[in-house]
């Protein structure tokens, strides 16, 4: 166990950062799931409202992924991979509807 005050503080900081990173990753996963659900809804019922909802969820997900990469929560390649998955899903849905 830590003996010095600085070591004890570092343990507290590491735990705080771990929880923040866990929360951030969870939010990214949730937003990605929402995007895929929005794709499914738009695929079944194409319309202006569902398309606007789809675009809004994609913008939120892309923004959150970029911020996670910027903060160092996600590796840049992981972020790029996730954004690519979302883009492929979006293009597939839009191509099928048109």
Swiss-Prot record:
Q: Any one Gene Ontology biological process term?
A: translation
Taken from the UniProt entry, a GO cellular component term is: small ribosomal subunit
Q: What does this protein do?
A: Binds directly to 16S ribosomal RNA.
Residue pairs linked by disulfide bridges in the UniProt entry: none
Record's family?
Belongs to the bacterial ribosomal protein bS20 family.
Signal peptide feature range: none
Entry protein name = Small ribosomal subunit protein bS20
Q: Does the keyword Acyltransferase apply?
A: no
> Highest taxon of the source?
Bacteria
**Listed GO molecular functions?**
small ribosomal subunit rRNA binding; structural constituent of ribosome
Gene3D superfamilies xrefs: Ribosomal protein S20
Q: Which SUPFAM superfamilies match?
A: Ribosomal protein S20
**Gene expressing this chain:** rpsT
Q: Does the record's keyword annotation contain rRNA-binding?
A: yes
Q: What are the UniProt keywords, alphabetically?
A: Ribonucleoprotein, Ribosomal protein, RNA-binding, rRNA-binding
């Amino acid at each position: 166990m830590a003996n010095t005050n600085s070591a004890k503080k570092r343990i507290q900081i590491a735990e705080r950062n771990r929880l923040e990173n866990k929360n951030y990753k969870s939010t990214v996963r949730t937003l990605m799931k929402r995007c895929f659900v929005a794709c499914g809804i738009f695929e079944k019922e194409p319309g202006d409202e569902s398309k606007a909802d789809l675009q809004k969820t994609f913008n939120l997900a892309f923004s959150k992924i970029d911020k996670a990469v910027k903060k160092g929560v996600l590796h840049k390649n992981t972020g790029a991979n996730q954004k690519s998955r979302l883009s492929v899903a979006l293009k597939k849905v839009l191509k099928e509807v048109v």
